[in-house]
């Protein structure tokens, strides 16, 4: 399948990006594609048929080719045993796409199509670059890293041999003033930003209203902005109303730079892109990793920020989760100096030029 936006006919061989399945793979690829295209380098995308990338990538003016492929993890032993039979046709399909476009270099950001696409690239002698966003690498990138020319990572510790370049973030977030400048002279309620992601996080929707109700007996006033996902909006609004806590509940926040700039503290999951944004913005956080994340990668991501003093980590499966959350928020909401120290520590981890750095490496490895 081909969704044509950018012409395949060009004087220059394109860079081919392999990414899909989730926004965590797709958005870093789009950021790097934007840098390459701004330099006049054509980009073509290889994705999986019927997945998120088939709708998202063309909206950014990039041509996408798709192959039929699906994941095998989490589908039982029979799926694993049958993986070679399912993957081989996808590899051959990827090779046909590669022969058509003759890319100068192939870059994997992970996802269903990245495995067959990366293997096909190496079989055809094309340079392969891998970028892993999480500290616990996905199965596809673990395999491809063994044969890749360059292995890049968003966090230290993903691979034994790696180049830590960071995860791409939006330019408006990276351009925010330093925490000390933003926080200077602030008065009034402490500003708490809660991010549940596009699908929402029910544990946050349930816990925050209850905990903030308990904290209302303190001397610290709190202003709450809670992003909960469209499907859970009514439920979240109801939880705050029942708890008697005023909050601005939103299904989606379009201007994340403004939201981070506004916030004194963030409560959120620990996806790689979110943590890269927290660091680029320079804001402290309470991280609640999604416990069902593959290879527990969100917890490992969070531990990197915790070790640097930029965040605190809570596990939602702990029996005393509500008690821990109340204790942590009571301390942080009443301690502006600690919030500032966490924000500055986060900013110290930022790699705001990640997209440009990755693009430079891609161009150096082009044939």
Curated annotation (Swiss-Prot):
GO molecular function: UDP-N-acetyl-D-glucosamine:N-acetylmuramoyl-L-alanyl-D-glutamyl-meso-2,6-diaminopimelyl-D-alanyl-D-alanine-diphosphoundecaprenol 4-beta-N-acetylglucosaminlytransferase activity; undecaprenyldiphospho-muramoylpentapeptide beta-N-acetylglucosaminyltransferase activity
Coarse class of the protein's main subcellular location: membrane
Keywords: Cell cycle, Cell division, Cell inner membrane, Cell membrane, Cell shape, Cell wall biogenesis/degradation, Glycosyltransferase, Membrane, Peptidoglycan synthesis, Transferase
Keyword Iron: no
Record has Cell cycle as a keyword: yes
Membrane topology listed for this record: Peripheral membrane protein
Reactions the enzyme catalyzes: di-trans,octa-cis-undecaprenyl diphospho-N-acetyl-alpha-D-muramoyl-L-alanyl-D-glutamyl-meso-2,6-diaminopimeloyl-D-alanyl-D-alanine + UDP-N-acetyl-alpha-D-glucosamine = di-trans,octa-cis-undecaprenyl diphospho-[N-acetyl-alpha-D-glucosaminyl-(1->4)]-N-acetyl-alpha-D-muramoyl-L-alanyl-D-glutamyl-meso-2,6-diaminopimeloyl-D-alanyl-D-alanine + UDP + H(+)
Entry EC no(s): 2.4.1.227
Top-level enzyme category: transferase
Entry function: Cell wall formation. Catalyzes the transfer of a GlcNAc subunit on undecaprenyl-pyrophosphoryl-MurNAc-pentapeptide (lipid intermediate I) to form undecaprenyl-pyrophosphoryl-MurNAc-(pentapeptide)GlcNAc (lipid intermediate II).
PANTHER family: GLYCOSYLTRANSFERASE, UDP-N-ACETYLGLUCOSAMINE--N-ACETYLMURAMYL-(PENTAPEPTIDE) PYROPHOSPHORYL-UNDECAPRENOL N-ACETYLGLUCOSAMINE TRANSFERASE 1
NCBIfam families: murG (TIGR01133)
Name of the protein this chain belongs to: UDP-N-acetylglucosamine--N-acetylmuramyl-(pentapeptide) pyrophosphoryl-undecaprenol N-acetylglucosamine transferase
Organism from which the protein derives: Xylella fastidiosa (strain M23)
Lineage of origin: Bacteria, Pseudomonadati, Pseudomonadota, Gammaproteobacteria, Lysobacterales
